[in-house]
Amino acid sequence: ESTTDAEDKNVSVNDTEEKEHIVVTDSIGRNVEIPYPVTKAVVANAYNTEIINAVGALDCVVGVDYNIYQDKESWKNRFTEDMVIGKSQKDLNYEKIIELQPEVLILTGNGTWEEAEKQLEPFGIKVIVCNAYYTNEFEKSCDILGKVFAREEKAEELKKYFMEKLDYIQNQLKDVPKKRVYFEYRTEGNTTVPGDFFYYMVEYSGADNIFKNASAVQVESEAVVEANPEYIIKVSASDVYSSYYPPTQEEHKAIKEEIMSRPGWDEIDAVKNDNILLLSHYVHGGASKLVGTMYIAKFLYPEQLSELHPETVFRDWLEEFQKLDYIEGHTYPEFSFED
């Protein structure tokens, strides 16, 4: 009998005390001591989950927020209702998290991480902030999540894939006059300004954001007409369901027609010259929105970026990094693999 006891005891000791511990510096500079590698995590925010998937650690995820759970197409139904840890990173169910017994909770900086820390500390569950929605923090997010799950090599591969393309864009556009762009997210007048979630997606494409000096994301229609952008980039519309399955051609067309028919917008160069690019909500967000950056860059500077093929990038993101089949139709106009 004593042997069995010892063995049982041994198993539990190995799971906890004897696991190596490391310190990870998270997105907001907190130093968090965690078991290494983490094998049980609960995660809020799809940007984080996508990178965890891309580094090959999705099997370690034992709980997700409702937004992730309900997007069944993007996650191939792998998350069940009993894995839901709350509506979003801002609305967490701590009882559920404790019940799932993860080693860490990973959430974004706009989530309730301070509250989470307070609630989960007594149960030994560590809280890691990872801001994978910020394009300019993509490398840092890869480093954090690669380290947490001991998938450093895969994280390096993921970083390299996208950073090489970003460097190419930067080098090719060094002396090129910037094209003036109006970016709109979902609803009319909702643009991007410094500090906002979409700012660097647009910035890294080499665009001159017409509202780069504005302080509020909501802008008046007249201000857009007055600024007269050469290009308009829009991420979907709020009434279009967005997931791995793209909007229909009809939905894309309706979004474009709505833009073109706004009062006074027929005066805008982008509308006159039909320089309007629509990105689905799903496609713009890949790899901390760097997939979105690739499409915007190519749309603005096709001659200078002959070796950048955003549709191929999107296919690689799906097939290699998300383990999903490639699907077309996420942009309007559509890009071929050669474009």
Question: Where are the language model's segments positioned?
Answer:
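Short, low-complexity disordered leader/linker segments with a strong preference
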Residues: 1-36
